[in-house]
Design a protein with these regions (language model features):
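Alpha-helical transmembrane segments of multi-pass membrane proteins
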Residues: 1-226
């Protein structure tokens, strides 16, 4: 049966992008000084610390990373609204471009600046794909997915509601795929160093394919609804 006929195609697309997010999380940590380029928490904390210690250049680098992340997030609204851009298709293309760019940035480059492509790509991925199966779930970090899986288990223990088991399964599967991607990122970084970013390209290609299958499914549903 073609994938686009599978009623869980949005879930499969979600898991594919979770693998991509996990890959870049591990890659950034191993190749770029232990900093995760998927989120802003550490970046902003380091910016405050550097400001208090008077490290002007570092503060500017962190501000740049913040601006890149905010810009990527805003573009997921601006591009579709102003020009009708399909962000679900554009996002993996941008991520692939970021992966290639990372290969040309020296390993000893200023860490935060070297992460700009990942900050940009992951901010776009996060806002372009916000979950599946009616669940809100990030594909670029694990905190909320861990929280939701834990809450679902607690709810099930209290109510014996089978829906909570399905909810827990969704978030646990997201965590699993995220860390499968991270494991691939570890291997890529170990064997290829900064050029290991290229290992993400098959994952990104598969995620893009899942987007096309989901779009076919949505088109079929629209025809049936008519």
């Amino acid at each position: 049966m073609p994938l686009y006929r599978n009623q869980h195609i949005d879930w499969y697309r979600h898991l594919a992008f979770a693998c991509v997010g996990g890959f870049f999380g591990a890659y950034a940590i191993l190749c770029r000084g232990g900093v995760m380029g998927n989120a802003q928490t550490m970046n902003l904390l380091e910016m405050i610390i550097d400001a208090l210690y008077g490290r002007g250049f570092n503060v500017l680098a962190h501000l740049g990373a913040f601006a890149v992340y905010v810009t990527g997030t805003m573009l997921t609204v601006l591009l579709p609204s102003l020009w009708g851009v399909n962000m679900r298709r554009l996002s993996p293309v941008i991520t692939a471009a970021a992966a290639v760019t990372e290969c040309f940035l020296p390993a000893d480059m200023t860490v935060i600046v070297a992460l700009y492509p990942i900050f940009f790509a992951m901010s776009i991925q996060w806002s372009s794909f916000q979950g599946a199966r009616s669940f809100y779930s990030s594909t670029i970090f694990s905190t909320n997915n861990t929280k939701q899986a834990s809450l679902a288990l607690a709810e099930y223990l209290c109510t014996k509601d089978g829906r909570q088991l399905r909810r827990m399964g969704f978030f646990l599967s997201t965590l699993l795929c995220f860390h499968i991607g991270a494991a691939i990122g570890v291997g890529a970084s170990h064997f290829w160093g900064v050029r290991g970013a290229l290992w993400s390209l098959p994952l990104i290609a598969w995620a893009f394919f899942m987007v096309t299958q989901e779009e076919k499914a949505e088109a079929m549903q629209a025809v049936v609804a008519e």
